[in-house]
């Protein structure tokens, strides 16, 4: 890792190309938060692997809880409620639950949903695509509990949680599907939460609602195929 023009730069060469990641000055060295792995996927040959998520690499629960707390502390001081959190399957289901758990200490009027790739016998809220994934289709179902369903219907703040945002396209696809479903008509603001955000200005430029982003680090990436 090196520093160039005030940015931190991390480079890695894979068998099919080279990726360069840069971020603004941060409390976290880039290599403390993630590494880059190669994968057999023609849509995207590389994968950001988190070192603090606790999914692909074993992580102390204390480290994970500290991450949830730090992300929650970056939320706006006031949230218009109710609040709906959505964690992305499969990687961010635990991350979303952890951030939700921390935020609801101060904003109890909220509910947590997750996407899934598995059809279940329940009422479908919406479906959307994670286009770069090996398994593109995501489903979100309504809660069974009547009180939670009412929270969803009345929600004014929508929180979307994923482990990382590479282009921001998945968040935008989900938001479009939710708006098309008519289920969250009262939402006024979106909060996009990630451990690492490489999407640049894409979310701000394309989000149809006021947006606040939360991440431990943000920056950009460049892929050079070989």
Predicted regions and their residues:
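PRPP-associated nucleotide enzymes
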Residues: 1-226
């Amino acid at each position: 890792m090196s520093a160039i023009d005030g940015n931190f730069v991390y480079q890695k060469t894979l068998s099919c190309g080279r990726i360069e990641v840069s971020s603004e000055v941060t409390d976290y060295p880039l290599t403390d938060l993630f590494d880059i792995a190669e994968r057999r996927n023609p849509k995207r040959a590389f994968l950001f692997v988190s070192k603090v998520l606790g999914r692909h690499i074993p992580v102390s629960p204390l480290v994970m809880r500290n991450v949830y707390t730090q992300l929650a502390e970056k939320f706006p001081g006031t949230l218009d409620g109710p609040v709906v959190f959505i964690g992305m399957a499969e990687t961010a289901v635990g991350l979303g639950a952890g951030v939700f758990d921390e935020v609801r200490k101060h904003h109890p009027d909220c509910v947590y949903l997750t996407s899934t790739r598995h059809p279940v016998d329940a009422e479908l809220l919406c479906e959307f695509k994670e286009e770069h994934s090996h398994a593109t289709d995501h489903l979100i179902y309504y809660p069974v509990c009547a009180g939670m369903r009412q929270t969803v219907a009345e929600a004014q703040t929508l929180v979307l949680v994923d482990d990382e945002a590479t282009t921001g396209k998945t968040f935008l696809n989900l938001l479009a599907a939710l708006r098309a479903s008519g289920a969250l008509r009262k939402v006024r603001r979106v909060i996009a939460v990630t451990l690492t955000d490489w999407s640049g200005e894409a979310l701000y430029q394309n989000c149809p609602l006021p947006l606040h982003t939360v991440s431990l680090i943000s920056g950009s990436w460049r892929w050079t195929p070989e």
